[in-house]
Amino acid sequence: MKNNYTSLKSPLDEEDELKTDHEIDLEKGPLPEYDSEEEGALPPYSDHALVNNPPNTHRENHSSGTTDNSSPLLIKLLISFTSIILFNAPAVCYLKYKDAFFKNYGAVEWTLFGFWCFVCTLALIFLTYFYETWTKAVKVTVISLAQCVKVTAVFLAKCVKVTAVGLYNSREKWVVIIWLLWVVICYTLFLRAKFGNLNLDKALICSTCSISAALLLFLLYVRLPFWTLKHMFSGLFQVLGVQSCVVIVQKGLMHLFDKHIDGTGYEIEASSLFVIGNFLFFYEMECPGALKRMPKFIRNGIASFLGGIANAIGGANDNNDIPLEETEAESEV
């Protein structure tokens, strides 16, 4: 029997199917070529491919969104406990300093200690429960304090600079006058230390006075270029180096000869080092490079002194080598 099956589709439906087969999906793009020879290869956009690679769900699409920023309970508890420990640390250090930490405790002391532990426990619970609130408050407070300290430091620095510039611009001789007044103040300290009114280490006053004078000059010369300030620091360290060498040589000689300096000797040492240090520093500021040229100057002076002695000795020897006949001829003339 012949199969008399006839399609129920109209010519218009068949034409629509042909158009649909040639249309391109705008979302998926054009269909790539399908190689049927490859094993296991499936045509793209097939139902099997959609099953193996399902589209992203709403949960996956929003996985990179906002997450819960709240800290875990254990971290909150640890930070709150650390803050309470830091708050109690000064009291514990004070009790340890007084040697009264858990020593000779009576009923009253133990009662107070138990009450304080109860208060700390309540504080721990409170801080853990309101963790976000008090941490934000602490951050805001720390930032505000840092800004206040910064503004105060800048204001004080500007005040010091304006004062120093005003003093320097008024008259340069004020630098010398203030430096001399500072020398008088330091000598007053020496006198008070000598008569016992002020207990200071007499052997170290010289360094303190020199550093103080250098800092004073540093403030007065603050408007000068940086190389001048650098030169001031260089001169200060050179002066302190000279003072250290003098002290080392003096102590070494005293130890070598088994001699000891009494109170008057310390005063003489401190006064001499103070005078030498301040003089060298001020001379270095007035004549830059004087300390660097000083070793060469001393070396040339010693060489010329020894050369003069050698010439004198050589001249005496030359006079002794004159023949006797020439001497008699000169005497006759």
From Swiss-Prot:
InterPro entries, alphabetized: WTF
Keyword Membrane: yes
Main location: membrane
GO CC field: cytoplasm; vacuolar membrane
Subcellular localization(s) per the UniProt record: Spore membrane; Vacuole membrane
Compositionally biased intervals (Basic and acidic residues): 19-30
Region (Disordered): 1-69
Assembly behavior: Homomer. Interacts with other proteins that exhibit high sequence similarity.
UniProt-recorded name of the protein: Meiotic drive suppressor wtf9
Gene: wtf9
